[in-house]
Design a protein with these regions (language model features):
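Feature recognizes metal-dependent phosphohydrolase scaffolds
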Residues: 1-650
Length: 650
């Protein structure tokens, strides 16, 4: 036995000091390895739509309903099954309404408790008792474990269960117990959650989504371009801060910053109202303005314009600082004829839709005015010192990454930058060229430096690279030749708005190219999949989210209402359970109120993308590999005990 191996086994013998102890652990671990794999739930592109996100989280993209159907099959009507599912999603709210209608609540409690116990029992069946025990609510842990655990050898099980349930009702704890069971079922039907990018964007509730995710039992996040933008803003990067505020203003969601995060926008509002007092700001209409009062709308439009002009200025400064980012070609303020109200692009002269720029000095167009400089400095301080925002960003850093390899699948938001021939594109980052997986690793390293580096130069590079990742032509999270923000505001010619996508998006059906990406990330091309967020799938035009014969799954979550008109549906989510991969296409979510009152679930059409020939077990997963290594180590310890190389400590 080699010295290092012997030293390791000696250490292991401290934990398992006898043949009996090591043998028991092997049996326990082997039992776990043989259990069915837990259900993974993939969501992408939530875009701040909290209500729809919360509902999909509660129903597990149909996993809860499937579990109810499995348990009650033909023994319950469809309506009763839907009522039970709604109760599981919204136990407190549903019971409030039931109390108004039901004559005999004790009977109702008894029926529902029995039904919920059966669903909980089925949901817990694929886990070890230890894992289920950890998921149990403290107040009812012992009782729930008694009710959902099979008791062989008990002669009068029914009487035993009846007595427990009767006591729960009698002492007035039925409703709390029902809530506990419902939340347990929600937790058990999904073992692990993957968020494949873009928690943030145009919707009103990204801060609420972050709060929800921080409470979730098991989650990982692959950063989207909007997530990186907020991370850059939280790190104090001025271009990112201006973009974040502009997008919130554009969609009428400045409340996210003011109420959600407590960031003071009053200096910006005062400045905008003064500078653009007589300007109608018609190019800066809000995308969502139905709920705005006229005066509030007017102020928002002025703030929208003020921060947009500031954004173009600070981006112009940053573009000069980092010419390798390729943003100098996106500088437009120096190409404007301020007397004529025109701009020269590509040798052509275009009329601007808005030519009122009171804060721009034509001789030095990218210089902030004294007031703009003060506003930006205050905003940098506000973003960096906002405790809640920093807490949310730390969570994104702790649970997130640019890509994730999980159970032989490759998860990322956006694209792997490619050349037109499908080869990996080399991208220059601070003087060095990178491609493929190395590009992701280097970029992620700089993102973390933007928060944690001790060297101020490295920290600044990290912050500024987040701005590039947000909208750079060769950024894996963006993947277009430009972000046509300026053109969309100021130019009527729609041909100037076009954003050319990276070749990756044209090559999604090319098996050689997709296999090359899997090879690059060290995955088995025969069994692995690429799970890709970011791009809305236009189902109404016949587009399919399943690409390359099932090797690539493009699952934009479609939570953003703006995209639902383009796609025809409310996006896709993915379930990967022990039977295979299930893709769910969702209809738009009406509202939480309708889900409770009218029992309107999100209607989902599920398609089995891949059914496994044999049911997948824990042994087939990443956790299973670790457990098998542990078993092999324990077997080596047993051999050492039996051969006398290591003495039992008994």
């Amino acid at each position: 036995m080699k010295a290092l191996e012997e030293k390791y086994l000696e250490g292991l013998s401290e934990l398992f000091p006898s043949i009996a102890a090591a043998s028991t652990e092997i049996i326990n671990l082997q039992a776990i390895v043989n259990l069915p794999k837990g259900t993974e739930h993939f969501l992408t592109d939530i875009h701040g739509e909290y209500e729809a996100f919360a509902h999909v989280l509660k129903n597990g993209s149909g996993s809860v309903k499937r579990k109810v159907d499995d348990v009650f099959a033909n023994t319950m009507s469809s309506r009763d099954k839907q009522t039970l599912a709604t109760l599981i999603y919204y136990p407190r709210e549903k019971m409030e309404r039931i109390r108004e209608e039901e004559q005999n609540m004790d009977d109702w409690y008894k029926i529902m408790l029995y039904r919920l116990i059966e669903v909980a029992k089925r949901s817990a069946s694929k886990y070890t008792r230890s894992k289920v025990r950890k998921a149990l609510p403290k107040d009812f842990a012992y009782v729930i474990e008694e009710l959902i655990t099979e008791k062989s050898g008990m002669t009068d099980k029914e009487s035993y269960y009846n007595s427990i349930i009767s006591t729960i009702i009698q002492i007035g704890r039925a409703e709390e117990f029902i809530v506990a069971l419902c939340e347990l079922i929600q937790r058990l039907v999904v073992d692990h959650l993957h968020i494949v990018g873009d928690i943030y964007d145009r919707g009103p509730g990204p801060h609420l989504i972050m709060d929800k995710l921080m409470e979730y039992h098991s989650v990982d996040i692959q950063w989207g371009n909007h997530d990186i933008l907020w991370m850059g803003a939280a790190a104090g990067q001025k271009c990112c801060i201006a973009n974040v505020i502009r997008i919130c203003a554009r969609y009428g969601n400045l409340d996210i910053l003011e109420d959600g995060y407590g960031i003071n926008l009053l200096p910006l509002a005062t400045f905008a109202w003064k500078q653009y007092a007589k300007d109608p700001c018609e190019c800066f209409l809000l995308k969502e303005q139905d709920n705005c009062k006229p005066q509030e709308l007017e102020l928002n439009m002025k703030m929208h314009k003020a921060i947009s002009v500031i954004q173009f200025k600070v981006e112009g400064q940053a573009a000069e600082l980092y010419p390798e980012f390729g943003f100098q070609r996106r500088n437009f303020l120096d190409k404007i004829n301020y007397e004529e109200g025109t701009i020269t692009i590509g040798g052509k002269i275009y009329q601007l839709l808005d030519d009122y720029f009171p804060t721009i000095d034509p001789k030095n167009p990218y210089q902030l005015s004294a007031e703009e400089e003060e506003i930006m400095n205050r905003l940098v301080k506000a973003f960096q010192s906002c405790e809640k925002l920093q807490r949310h960003m730390r969570f994104l850093l702790n649970k997130g990454s640019l890509y994730k390899i999980y159970n032989s699948n490759l998860l990322y938001h956006g694209c792997v930058p490619l050349n037109d021939d499908g080869s990996l594109r080399k991208v220059k980052i601070y003087g060095k060229s990178y491609q493929g997986r190395t590009l992701y690793d280097v970029m992620e390293s700089y993102v973390r430096k933007g928060f944690f580096a001790v060297d101020p130069d490295e920290k600044k590079k990290g912050r500024d690279l987040m701005w590039y990742i947000w909208q750079g032509a060769n950024s894996p999270l963006f993947g277009k030749d430009k972000m046509a923000t300026f053109e969309r505001y100021f130019l009527a010619e729609k041909e100037l708005w076009k954003e050319k996508k990276n070749a990756y998006y044209l090559l999604l059906e090319d098996e050689n190219v997709m296999n090359g990406i899997l090879d690059e990330f060290g995955l088995d091309r025969e069994i692995s999949h690429i799970i890709n967020g970011h791009v809305p799938v236009k189902t109404k035009n016949g587009e399919n989210p399943v690409k390359c014969g099932g090797k690539v799954l493009v699952i934009d979550g479609g939570f953003s209402k703006a995209y639902q008109k383009e796609t025809g549906i409310a996006g896709y989510t993915l379930i990967y359970n022990s039977y295979g991969l299930i893709l769910a296409a969702h209809d738009p979510f009406e509202s939480t109120e309708a889900a409770i009152e009218k029992e309107r679930d999100i209607h989902s059409d599920s398609v089995i993308v891949k059914r496994t020939l044999e049911r997948k077990t824990v042994g087939d997963t990443d956790v299973g590999k670790v457990l098998k290594e542990r078993i092999a180590d324990l077997e080596a310890l047993l051999d050492a005990y039996r051969s006398g190389q290591i003495i039992e400590k008994v």
